[in-house]
């Protein structure tokens, strides 16, 4: 797996869509004939408008995201080809990340470097915990609880660090980049601003659901280890 694929895969896996976020996006997924273009067309227009060098737009099946390594805004087909409010908001949000990248946002650069490392740490920590009974049988020396707990915590703590770094990046992309762009450029009507704001908030809060999922997983592992 290439470094780029690792980053993209880890980013997508780290951002499950929460129930409220999914509802907000689906609620405004109906076509808006008055829209001047689709999500994909808006993304291309904004990239040209803000002179984002070498940034391209393409369709993906891995979830909407911006790839800072390959400089690509990737949108789901349903957002790339759609004139819905959700498509427009999501496209602007992802271009917001491209703008952050061009501006040299240190938080985005830090997250990009952290993701592949955290992904490996998380995977290895879970694998070691899962294989601990087998390791104990082979070595004839059960792994101490403290070591198992430390290994388990390392992966979850690493993922929590990613969430802590990511949340402000997402809110900046939504409310310091996408919303002002859509409002000031008259890409959405004033009557639709509230709906767009809800969609952008949902996009940013997907990381909160990811953090909560990790906390639940951590609690599950602690319970399992305490029973050993």
Predicted regions located by residue number:
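Low-acidity, Ser/Thr- and Arg-rich intrinsically disordered low-complexity segments
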Residues: 2-18
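Polar-ligand-bearing catalytic/cofactor-coordination segments
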Residues: 21-121, 161-228
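Hydrophobic faces of alpha-helical transmembrane segments in multi-pass integral membrane proteins
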Residues: 4, 17, 88, 92, ...
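Juxtamembrane "helix exit" motif at the C-terminal ends of alpha-helical transmembrane segments
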Residues: 1-3, 125-142, 214-228
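Hydrophobic transmembrane alpha-helical segments that form the core helix bundle
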Residues: 117-176
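Generic alpha-helix initiation/capping and coil-helix boundary signal
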Residues: 7-8, 36, 145, 166
